[in-house]
Amino acid sequence: MISFRQVEQEDIVSTKYEVMSGKILRYSPDGAALVNSEMDAYWSSLYEMQNPVADIRGDWAVIADVDGTSMKIFDKDGEAGSVTTSYSIVKARISSNGLVAAILDGGDSTWINYYDSDGT
């Protein structure tokens, strides 16, 4: 039987926090939210990722599922785009205008793909 305290602790361990637009980007394998210091949400977005890693530049963030194939792109107002890649994501970086560069592992080849802020 899992107690509430154990579930709360697991959530804290899997949740990460980064500064974005002077606020806090809170993200986990289940979703992301931009919150203030009281944890009141400006926006939230649900997704499923095994190993989410965020990169932030100014008002833009990308959350990539490292070793997976999905990325979510956010600005200060919420989700701007979504990407599903053909190969496993090694690393993703975002520019201050929302352009995403991703290194993908294609087995015998390594790819660097670029995506606009809407995921195209």
Place the predicted regions along the sequence by residue:
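A short beta-strand motif characteristic of beta-propeller blades
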Residues: 2-9, 39-46, 77-84, 120
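Short coil-to-beta transitions that initiate beta-strands within beta-rich domains
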Residues: 6, 11-12, 43, 48-51, ...
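Short, positively charged
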Residues: 11-14, 36
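Short beta-strand elements that form the blades of beta-propeller/WD-repeat-like
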Residues: 15-28, 32-33, 52-66, 71-72, ...
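Domain-scale macromolecular recognition modules
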Residues: 31, 35-36, 44
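Short, intrinsically disordered, charge-balanced linker/junction segments flanking boundaries
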Residues: 113-120
